[in-house]
């Protein structure tokens, strides 16, 4: 069963990512001080996440963990 967008947001925030301005509509942009670039999530918080979004978040969280 796919995870919800809100669960991916919680994973990013617990890893130290912060939401920054720049997303339009249901797009949200997250940055981390130790990681270059941004992670972009699209879709309402209650929607199911696509597999590529889950993979993107999982990879970003692994990059910043010590």
Question: Which stretches of residues belong to each language-model region?
Answer:
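Basic nucleic-acid-binding interfaces
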Residues: 1-22, 30-66
